[in-house]
């Protein structure tokens, strides 16, 4: 008896029996346990009205053969019972009898009896093998897992793990999954058979085709004797009573291969080319499903149309443009540091040549101011003047006076206004203004004739330039300063052509000049400040 029973078991059931025998259970004990289980427990309360499974029709003596698993599930779940296979579930949540099982049990038609027998047969087989069969069927017909979840009420994560990895699932849940699978097979077969010979281009024919698809049948009743998974169950708010959502169109692998090959040839096909691709894709989808290409109108929601082909090509072009833009954005940041480094080197080189005089003047000149008597003394060598710096602009208008060239009045006014600016900008702009004056003085001092040298004169906060006559002398290399007699609001700074005391030839203003008051400035780079 045990040998005959093993021959009817699946590989998984044989492994379970082997594990029981390896645990120390003898054959006699196992057979006795099976005989004790033959009288069905009272809590199941199953009453078999007519034999539905082939084994029960043969009048087998085994308890498992005399009671169909499908009826056991519906009766056990209705009374809170639990089967031995339920412990294998990983989610552990309570799962009542799915509405799809109760609907199938309530039907007394011949087709419903065949479906129950088919579900019983699948429950007795290896769950992992059945799961792979269902997964292959869903891929063949482009059926999303969401549709299974909506009909059966299963958890989508648990369903995905069961189909992809063989994760254990409760028997009641597997029965709901198998019931959906059996009904879906018959439904798809009817879809291809009933619309055979109709013209897919006819809109009325297309409406008739869509009526057979549950996702387009908003009445909630499916065709055939199965009763439909979308039929209302009652006022209990079961998942089967809610309205089915329409499945989104999903490109099959056969159609995608055709479209990608066409995209390599032509990225923007014409309308005629798109219509040819429609026929080719529908033919490939029919071959994938194992039906004749003449039944392409039975694809329903998976039917390829010219609009869908147009949208597919448009989306591919957008994706390609986006990838190109992304590649450029990724490449550009690597080039920016190189460009900025090159620009900084060029800017540094030009700045070094333009500001060479300003940098030298800043290192040689020390400026100082006083609140009551602002005074600045600077010592600049005429040889250090560079005519290429930016301060000597050729656009500036100069005022010609006897013996030299003076800057315009606006420049002198700017010197006074710059002295009132902030301390941060004061030093920089003051150097620019005085550098301009120094350059003019150098041009005057390098003349071989007797020149009129401009002298900075600050009177009551107003800065002016006065021409002063100097006799002809040798090369001028030093800068001297002198102050005149004690005047309360005036002090003059002039540039001497020699290191020794200068001889002034201006009788009107400097007749009382005492040569002893002229101080000698050495060759050091420091600039003395005299204030009184």
From Swiss-Prot:
It is found in: Nucleus. Residues 102-197 form the POU-specific atypical domain. Residues 1-35 are annotated as: Dimerization. Keywords: Activator, Developmental protein, DNA-binding, Homeobox, Nucleus, Transcription, Transcription regulation. The keyword Acetylation does not apply. Residues 222-231 have a biased composition (Gly residues). Residues 74-95, 222-245, 500-532 are annotated as: Disordered. Residues 505-532 have a biased composition (Polar residues). InterPro entries: HD, HNF-1, HNF-1_N, HNF-1_POU, HNF1_dimer_N_dom_sf, HNF1b_C, HNF_P1, Homeodomain-like_sf. Residues 5-36 form the HNF-p1 domain. Residues 244-324 bind DNA. Its main location: nucleus. GO terms for cellular component: nucleus. GO terms for molecular function: DNA-binding transcription factor activity, RNA polymerase II-specific; RNA polymerase II cis-regulatory region sequence-specific DNA binding. First expressed at stage 10 in the intermediate mesoderm. Expressed in rhombomere r5 by 14 hpf with expression diminishing by 18 hpf. One of its GO terms (biological process) is positive regulation of DNA-templated transcription. The keyword Cytoplasm does not apply. Transcription factor that binds to the inverted palindrome 5'-GTTAATNATTAAC-3'. Acts downstream of hnf1ba but is not required for induction of rhombomere r5/r6 gene expression in the hindbrain. Belongs to the HNF1 homeobox family. Binds DNA as a dimer. Can form homodimer or heterodimer with HNF1-alpha. This is Hepatocyte nuclear factor 1-beta-B. The lineage of its organism: Eukaryota, Metazoa, Chordata, Craniata, Vertebrata. The gene is hnf1bb.
């Amino acid at each position: 008896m045990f040998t005959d029973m093993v021959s009817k078991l699946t590989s998984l059931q044989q492994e379970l029996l082997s594990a029981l025998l390896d645990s120390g259970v003898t054959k006699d004990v196992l057979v006795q346990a099976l005989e004790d289980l033959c009288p069905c427990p009272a809590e199941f309360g199953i009453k078999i009205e007519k034999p539905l499974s082939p084994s029960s029709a043969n009048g087998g003596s085994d308890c498992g053969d005399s009671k169909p698993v499908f009826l056991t599930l519906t009766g056990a779940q209705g009374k809170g019972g639990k089967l031995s296979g339920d412990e294998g579930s990983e989610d552990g949540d309570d799962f009542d009898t799915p509405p799809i099982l109760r609907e199938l049990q309530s039907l007394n038609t011949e087709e419903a009896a065949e479906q129950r027998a088919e579900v019983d047969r699948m429950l007795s087989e290896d769950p992992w093998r059945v799961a792979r069969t269902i997964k292959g069927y869903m891929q063949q017909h482009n059926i999303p897992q969401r549709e299974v979840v909506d009909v059966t009420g299963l958890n989508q994560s648990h369903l995905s793990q069961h189909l992809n990895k063989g994760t254990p699932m409760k028997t009641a849940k597997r029965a709901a999954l198998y019931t959906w699978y059996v009904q879906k097979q018959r439904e798809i077969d009817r879809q291809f058979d009933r619309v055979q010979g109709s013209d897919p281009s006819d809109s009325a024919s297309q409406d008739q085709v869509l009526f057979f698809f549950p996702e387009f049948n908003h009445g909630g009743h499916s065709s055939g004797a199965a009763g439909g998974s979308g039929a209302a169950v009652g006022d209990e708010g079961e998942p089967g009573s809610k309205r089915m959502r329409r499945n989104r169109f999903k490109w099959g692998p056969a159609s995608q291969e055709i479209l990608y090959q066409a995209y390599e040839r032509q990225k923007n096909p014409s309308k005629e080319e798109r219509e040819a691709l429609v026929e080719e894709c529908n033919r490939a989808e029919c071959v994938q499903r194992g039906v004749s290409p003449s039944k392409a109108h039975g694809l329903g929601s998976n039917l390829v149309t010219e609009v869908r082909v147009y949208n597919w090509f448009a989306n591919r072009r957008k994706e390609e443009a986006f990838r190109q833009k992304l590649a450029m954005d990724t490449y550009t940041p690597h080039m920016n540091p190189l460009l900025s480094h090159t620009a900084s080197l060029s800017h540094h080189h030009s700045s070094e040549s333009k500001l060479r005089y300003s940098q030298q003047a800043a290192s040689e000149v020390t400026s100082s101011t006083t609140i009551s008597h602002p005074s600045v003394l600077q010592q600049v060598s005429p040889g250090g003047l560079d005519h290429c710096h930016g301060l000597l602009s050729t656009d500036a208008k100069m005022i010609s006076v006897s013996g030299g060239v003076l800057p315009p009045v606006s420049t002198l006014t700017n010197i006074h206004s710059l002295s009132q600016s902030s301390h941060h900008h004061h030093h920089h702009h003051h150097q620019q203004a005085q550098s301009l004056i120094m350059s003019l003085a150098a041009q005057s001092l390098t003349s071989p004739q007797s020149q009129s040298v401009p002298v900075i004169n600050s009177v009551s906060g107003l800065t002016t330039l006065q021409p002063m006559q100097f006799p002809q002398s040798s090369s001028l290399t030093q800068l001297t300063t002198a102050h005149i007699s004690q005047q309360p609001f005036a002090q003059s700074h002039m540039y001497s052509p020699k290191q020794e005391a200068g001889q002034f030839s201006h009788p009107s203003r400097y007749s009382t000049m005492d040569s002893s008051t002229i101080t000698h400035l050495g060759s050091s780079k420091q600039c003395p400040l005299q204030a009184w």
